[in-house]
Amino acid sequence: MPFTLGQRWISDTESELGLGTVVAVDTRMITLLFPASGENRLYSRSDAPITRVMFNPGDTVTSHEGWQLKVDDVREEKGLLVYCGQRLDDETSAELREVFLDSKLTFNKPQDRLFAGQIDRMDRFALRYRARKHQNEQALQQWGGLRGMRASLIPHQLHIAHEVGQRHAPRVLLADEVGLGKTIEAGMIIHQQLLAGRASRVLIIVPETLQHQWLVEMLRRFNLLFSLFDDERYAEAKLDSSNPFETEQLVICSLGFVQRNAQRFAQLVNADWDLLVVDEAHHLVWSEESPSAEYQAVETLARATPAVLLLTATPEQLGQQSHFARLRLLDPNRFHDYQEFLAEQQQYRPVADAVTLLLAGEKAQTAELNALSDLLGEQDIEPLLKAINSDSDDNQKARQELIAMLMDRHGTSRVLFRNTRQGVKGFPQRILHQIRLPLPSQYQTAIKVSGIMNANKTLEVRARDMLYPEQIYQQLEGDDATWWNFDPRVEWLLNYLTANRDEKVLVICAQAATALQLEQVLRTREAIRAAVFHEGLSILERDRAAAYFASEEEGAQVLICSEIGSEGRNFQFASHLVMFDLPFNPDLLEQRIGRLDRIGQAKEIQILVPYLENTAQAMLVRWYHEGLDAFEHTCPTGRTIYDAHHAQLIERLTTVGEQQGLDEFIHTCRQQHDNLKQQLEQGRDRLLEMHSNGGEQAQLLAQAIAEQDNDVNLVTFALNLFDIVGINQEDRSDNLIILTPSDHMLVPDFPGLPQDGCTITFDRDQALSREDAQFISWEHPLIRNGLDLVLSGDTGSCAVSLLKNKALPVGTLLAELVYVVEAQAPKHLQLTRFLPPTPVRLLMDRKGTNLAAQVEFESFNRQLNAVNRHTSSKLVNAVQADVHAMLQQAEALVEAQARQLITEAQEQADLQLRRELERLEALKAVNPNIREDELTALESQREQVLSNLHEANWRLDAIRLVVVTHQ
């Protein structure tokens, strides 16, 4: 092509320079000026890697002055193009010579990029199409937010999260027993609400001691990066905003932190949260006469926030008044009068009795049948009542149907979820081993001296000190004291570990100093590999210690944890727990055992307690075991009995030598424990348990998600994505891959990839046992960000390939076109449930025939060969007129497919949302816990969804030209 001064060209290799202008031409060389970047380039005339920029009728171009022109015609004058058409600003006719085109011109449409020579690699085109397909398939999955968590697939947890997470502004009480995973349930609900766009701002309020546990759980299990607000962080944020809480979307803080300052609390309330989560909500004290300041603070926040999750102890442990107080936070209009609530609860007693009858499988007597009829009076249930007393195959089905009807009418089943260990099977047996050891003379002396020196300390402080004689000795003797040389617990631990080399052993002690000293002794005395876990370590350092312990190959045999350091970490792969000392209260004891005693623990848990005779430890072992049965079973009564006997317990811990009355004290505690436990068992609400654990549906949900684990398509796509993006991958032998950034990535910082890299696995079980490995799923930020990176930009939007096929004539031209059918709408409407961005692939020939149905993408892609960009540009220029014609023919074909997709989406949305609305309206007639605002929100959502689907459209997303060759 002849070159003329003023012509506009674009660089094939440096498209970021913008639009270039020919400023010098001689016999062998040309010079281009790129005004947008201020750069000059000198090219050889014979083979310059540049492409002439030529627009066509229908295109919109921008002048260097900023106004835009809709092109109607193009003519050439002395080698320069003149665009004729209508200005978009004042609708007047105008001409624009190419020399006056905006130099910052970018090409967004795939066909424009193709004709401008901005041609991408063919592997990127394939990646873009696969990304579109996978994005579409994942959007249609019904378990979004549940699949990507790094946690075992526990049916009752999945059921609660699925049930609550799908609601508009859920306000519920999660009251599972300890060890059943309330934190995970809350995390799954948060994750779903965020992914679905129902929430974007989340506030978690927890006790100060649990802040880091929540921070770790949300990050490690759900890849949610919360900001922990304390005084220091608040002061920093105050520099950036008048309301510091508006500087972050996801926030964790303690109630004490915000209560200390009235202005701070007001800012928190006014920060427009979408979802409020309150842990340990049973500590919020309430009475009708004088609610506590903490309760009132949470009440104020709950009223200002649409969605609320309260995590609390079980209702039976709380007592009815305390339970009512929690429900009142969720729905003050519904739960406004305590006496009315008590009367209503009595009315639900027959419902629970009826369910017990149906579950038992026995035939119903006349009185029982009448009771069922009364409870479900407005329904035609006569056939079902007959079926439950028959021997037909319909018996069980009828019972399940009646139970489902009763559940819909249950008083608080929509706002309260409560599972018990008895209702959820799969927990291991706990076996206690008490190891009685002699009290060394050094400790005897230290304890006596300490008693004299610390007489002015409070009784409680002295009692706590008595539990840790090694610390008493260390304080008296100084830093050079070597208590581990004579403490018989150390010798016992060494012998136990050397005798059980093949077992992973978790050792927990109260103090970080004790943990560090024990690790040193194990390493120097017996070369035992041990990791240490304490509050002085960063989260990353704790991850590494946990991973070292979890590793089967060359991993640590022992993990030594301090009390605080072990919070929020679970080690189900180990089954041996050594308590080097004992905690001060039963909640901490259960927390220690809970590190191993989780659903998914495959072995019996061996609890080993080496204790020194005639010490506070010895007395506490007896009280925990004989008084509370707290070692071998969970102890829901522990806190109640501890509070009731707190003063007496402290006194006995400080006067261990005086054994008088100890047996009676322990016997009294045991009687109280047995009585309370019996009351709790009698108060079990089996209907609520059924509703909370999800039954067979929950099992099917867990199975369905498990079947999607280790998805081969995910592994293939992810590795292909990492390759093309330019992320380094290093395979490890144990199903792990190390990812690190490279110098040639598509973007300087890949979202979700740390600067120092990360370790990933596609195996859920592997991720659970390796704290340092990230579990890759379709919901992981690396994959979601990767999809966004590819699809939100131009990556792979146009390509040119060669097809070596002697069955076709040389020069045969095919255009592979990928259109996207999509609807634009606010995220919270979740339009993607019905019409996610949907790729429609066409494979056009010159005759206007679509061959896509006969030629599958992957097999076709494998037959193609890449072409360099310069050659590609020449090919495109040669067939530009043909491509325009093919695009026009394709437009008519894609319209029919797109309109069909849109119509189907409208019908599905109307049917699904109408059914949902009708179901809630029917339930509201029999269950007052259906809130009016839920119905209003659903009706509004239905109208908006249908309106936005009506506006759905389609566009060309990617184009690949394929030219047949025989060479």
Curated annotation (Swiss-Prot):
Annotated ranges, domain Helicase ATP-binding: 163-333
Taxonomic superkingdom: Bacteria
UniProt-listed CDD domains: DEXDc_RapA, SF2_C_SNF
Molecular functions per Gene Ontology: ATP binding; DNA binding; helicase activity; hydrolase activity, acting on acid anhydrides
Listed GO biological process terms: regulation of DNA-templated transcription
Top EC class, one word: hydrolase
Enzyme Commission (EC) number: 3.6.4.-
Keywords: Activator, ATP-binding, DNA-binding, Helicase, Hydrolase, Nucleotide-binding, Transcription, Transcription regulation
Pfam families to which the protein is assigned, alphabetical: Helicase_C, RapA_C, SNF2-rel_dom, Tudor_1_RapA, Tudor_RapA
Domain Helicase C-terminal: 489-643
Chain residues that bind ATP: 176-183
Motif (DEAH box) on chain: 279-282
Assembly and interaction partners: Interacts with the RNAP. Has a higher affinity for the core RNAP than for the holoenzyme. Its ATPase activity is stimulated by binding to RNAP.
NCBIfam families: PRK04914.1
PANTHER family associated with the record: DNA ANNEALING HELICASE AND ENDONUCLEASE ZRANB3 FAMILY MEMBER, SWI_SNF-RELATED MATRIX-ASSOCIATED ACTIN-DEPENDENT REGULATOR OF CHROMATIN SUBFAMILY A-LIKE PROTEIN 1
Family recorded in the similarity comment: Belongs to the SNF2/RAD54 helicase family. RapA subfamily.
Role, per record: Transcription regulator that activates transcription by stimulating RNA polymerase (RNAP) recycling in case of stress conditions such as supercoiled DNA or high salt concentrations. Probably acts by releasing the RNAP, when it is trapped or immobilized on tightly supercoiled DNA. Does not activate transcription on linear DNA. Probably not involved in DNA repair.
The name this protein goes by in its record: RNA polymerase-associated protein RapA
Species, as recorded: Pectobacterium carotovorum subsp. carotovorum (strain PC1)
